[in-house]
Structure formats: structure tokens, C-alpha cells
Regions:
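Short beta-strand->loop
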Residues: 72-75, 169-181
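C-terminal effector-binding regulatory domain of bacterial HTH transcription factors
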Residues: 37, 160-165, 169, 179-221
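Hydrophobic residues within well-ordered alpha-helices
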Residues: 101, 147-152, 167, 188
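Flexible hinge/capping segments at coil-to-helix
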Residues: 69-111, 125
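Short helix-loop hinge/linker segments at domain boundaries
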Residues: 1-14
Length: 221
């Protein structure tokens, strides 16, 4: 659009973001303040959307890109952590080894796109049998698992950015940290095109420069 190239980026921008509001909302609101002429149409979902068929301009997802029709840029990394409330650990004890989780209430996340449970990234002894953890609760949104864990009802495996505040205030405690082997990456994906409109370009650049920069500054405080 000619008007877009001659002035501030404008127009409707359709984006899909995962259900990680505490991570993305500060950057998203800052983008809206910086580019008020860009109209955001936001879909919050953990499902694997078809970027092109569903008409999205940009989506944010984890993992490695698999669609050759899409371009991508990494946003930053995160780690999964096992957390529980002090009250829960006082009542049930602190697990010292991964195998001890079999005697605990375990709160699991189910991937909406596949229906599979998200594996807990526990490093066990070579040759050890795969742990069959109790499924005290299964939920397709991590936010609910955070609430249940904070209420003292079990141990949850959640991204570090979701539990950082609760850990800092003592509402949650990390367990089995030395047995966790995980690093995930968030990426922005958009349809491959010779022409990248200004509204898409500024959104990508803004999120790359802001999203995990905010997170790193919080870690340093």
C-alpha cells in the first residue's frame, strides 16, 4: 500500500500468539503505543495454526520451523522448571531424585494441537526406565497449572518466565533443578514474500528487540 510507505506503518495486522500473556503483553502494549495506526487483530492460541491458509501476517511459536513457505526469526529462549508451593512440599516432602516424583501429585500440560502430554525434561541415569508420572491433573493451558501449583495441589512443569514472579516472592519453589535438561526457543514466523509490508516489518523488529530484552532486564534486577 502506497500510503504505508510514505508515513507511519498503518493498517490491520493479524497475528497469532501462544497463551503466554505475562511474557508478551508488555511488549505488545508497548508496540501499540509506538505504532497507534497499526490495528492489531490478535489470536491467542497454543494450536498449530496454518499461517497462510488462515491469513495470518505473523505468528509466534516455539520449536524449529518446518514449513518451507515461511520465514522465521528467533525471539529468545526459555527453560522449563519444576515448581511447587512451600505448603505442598512441607506436606509431601521435597523430591531429591526424579524417581521420587512417582509418589507426588504431578500437574501436566497437554498440547492442544496433538493431544499429547508435554514431556517433563528430566535427565535420568543411563539405562533407567522411563518414568511413568502420576497424572493428578491434565490441562491444555499452562496458566491453570500455575494457579493449581500455587494453591499447593502438586508439582508442575512450567516455563521459567511464567513462574519467575511466584518464585521471587516465595509462592513457588523450584525442585530437581539439576535434573532438568531443557531449552526452548520462541520464533516469529510469517509468509515468505519478496515484499514485506512496513507494518509487518516494524512488528517483527519491535518484538525481536523488545520481548526478551524486557525479560533480561527483569532477571538482572
Amino acid at each position: 500500500e502506497q500510503s504505508e510507505t510514505q508515513q507511519m506503518p498503518s493498517g490491520r495486522l493479524r497475528i497469532s500468539l501462544p497463551l503466554v500473556g505475562p511474557l508478551v503483553m508488555p511488549a505488545l502494549t508497548a508496540f501499540m503505543l509506538r505504532y497507534p495506526a497499526v490495528e492489531l487483530d490478535v489470536d491467542f492460541s497454543d494450536r498449530m495454526v496454518d499461517v497462510i491458509e488462515e491469513g495470518f501476517d505473523v505468528v509466534m511459536r516455539t520449536g524449529e520451523p518446518t514449513d518451507s513457505r515461511l520465514m522465521s526469526r528467533p525471539l529468545g529462549s526459555y527453560r522449563l522448571q519444576l515448581v511447587a508451593s512451600p505448603d505442598y512440599l512441607k506436606r509431601h516432602g521435597v523430591p531429591e531424585l526424579p524417581a521420587e516424583l512417582c509418589h507426588h501429585a504431578c500437574l501436566h500440560h497437554r498440547f492442544p494441537s496433538t493431544g499429547r502430554l508435554e514431556p517433563w525434561p528430566l535427565s535420568c541415569e543411563p539405562g533407567a526406565e522411563e518414568l511413568k508420572l502420576p497424572t493428578t491433573m491434565i490441562c491444555n493451558t499452562s496458566a491453570a497449572l500455575l494457579d493449581v501449583a500455587t494453591a499447593g495441589l502438586g508439582i508442575a512443569c512450567l516455563p521459567d518466565f511464567m513462574v519467575r514472579q511466584a518464585v521471587a516472592t516465595g509462592e513457588l519453589l523450584r525442585v530437581l533443578d539439576k535434573y532438568i535438561d531443557h531449552q526452548g526457543t520462541f520464533r516469529l514466523l510469517w509468509p515468505s514474500s519478496k515484499y514485506l509490508s512496513p507494518k509487518i516489518r516494524v512488528f517483527i523488529d519491535f518484538m525481536v528487540g523488545t520481548l526478551f530484552a524486557e525479560r533480561e532486564s527483569q532477571k538482572e534486577r
